[in-house]
């Protein structure tokens, strides 16, 4: 596993996971760690929250992006985010006027090209609507200073019209376009550029939601809300850079702890297969750190060896893992003559585990449909935990899950159900799926099947084949520093510096400071000046 920390603070506000089952599992562990007050949500739910009033749960819903959807998978990469950035920047350039503004009926320049561009350049973090409001305030203050300072008078109706004109010259601050229509227009532009994806109407995947949250924050928002001071992301490899770029923009000023394992990236086409891009995005501070959690405390030596043999079938690099020495039962791989025998042996194996005292048991299938059908069959023989991904609470008992929903979980015993060649062809994506399934087991792992077993599990790996390993030199150590003490004089100087910064910042959004000059001293009456010899000192009497 990997742990990536950015500015670790005292307050944890958000825990982000890939699905509700994982979050419910984490929630059960947190009280044991004496950690309270943490809000947990999936990445989809977080982006929905960032849409605020623009999300209508009666009208819209979200769905999971299909794993084999190559066309829509391109929405998860960083290039897609870059395209969205450029599209929003071009839109802002068109919407915000850059023309010089003169006081009506005069040649007095109120705001010029240079000033407008300076304000826009110096406030890149503001949304388009916030920039419009800022420019309106700057222009109106210039207008008021000009009119009041030079005592220019207008008829009441003219003055009222001018006030209205300059108060909303750059726009009224209310964006009338729907973020959904704006997003669909962006997707149409992408299609023309040869990057066609499905255009959603009322159902959105995580990358649609990420884009919508970015558009809201980048274009529409006028009243920013600080959602969190620290965010913890688990199973980070499941999300592509598009999600992280949008999250980084929407939660600016937030610190992060990001954890994951690229060997368990089951979304091979759009998840993270290495950490380089994410490191460059978030690890920018002096005391940010990137490190490895090498020790694996979950699996027995036998299960760990079986899982690592699966991993060696891939041609991708991995981070080396050091399992602790804990031996257990050998992994059992057993073929059944037909589907009926497969079901009977599944029931027999589960009952034996229950007799042995195992409290958490998982039967792992390839797809959700297969898991649901098998769960219905097993209910005739034993009690099965409800495994609805949206509502399930992790707990004791027998769970029948698709491999996708087992990520991040661990069970006393795991039965890998019918992993045939058809379900798990020999490619990198399915290598990672089988690796995830195998590493869920704490004590016992059994593989039951009928038909042709996946070649990932049958084909031997050449002893000459070397597993690609990421270089350890890429790690960074968290920096240590001593707390610096300041003298009272240094503290006062810092306060004066901060006050100057605040005063300069306020000049952007309010009237300029009025410089008040000290009154000139009156010339003294020369009759009251007496020059005395020989010193010739001037003595002035008042």
Where are these regions (language model features)?
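Alpha-helical nucleic-acid-binding subdomain
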Residues: 10-232, 237-246, 254, 273, ...
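Intrinsically disordered, low-complexity N-terminal extensions of nucleic-acid-metabolism proteins
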Residues: 479-528, 532
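Single conserved hydrophobic/aromatic residue that forms the stacking wall/gate
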Residues: 2-12, 529-542
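Conserved helicase motor core of SF1/SF2 NTP-dependent helicases
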Residues: 9, 20-28, 32-36, 41-46, ...
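Intrinsically disordered low-complexity regions specifically enriched for long asparagine
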Residues: 15, 334, 359-361, 520-529
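Charged, solvent-exposed alpha-helical segments that act as regulatory interaction surfaces
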Residues: 93, 316, 537-540
